[in-house]
Amino acid sequence: MKIYEKMSWVGLANYIINNLKEGDTIEFATDYTEWEGYHCWYFIRIVRIPEYQSRFIVIDYCGGGEAYVIPLNNYSHEFDEDDKDYVREYIKDYFKLCNNLGFEDAPVWVEEEV
């Protein structure tokens, strides 16, 4: 069974900061469709490019083939203060982007019931 909780950009940013570790994936759904009750599934993941030791948060959105990328501090495995600021800023912009595409609401966070 899935539990759906509508989140604001602040809620999603804080969830990422408090819970996302390298290699983890957050799955979420949006109700950005013209069909009621139909959800599109996406993911948020931290990825590392080993050649550069660079880390990014990648958000798959708006139907495969497009991604939203948040750069992270290269020197840490945890979120430092700059990372937290980046995440908040970029997630706020991500919500604006989705709204500019005609989507009316925030992503729907989806959790698995244990």
What are these regions (language model features)?
Residues 111-113:
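Intrinsically disordered/linker segments and immediately adjacent domain-edge residues
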Residues 24-109:
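Acidic, low-complexity, intrinsically disordered interaction modules
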Residues 2-36:
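Negatively charged, low-complexity tracts enriched in Asp/Glu with abundant Ser/Thr
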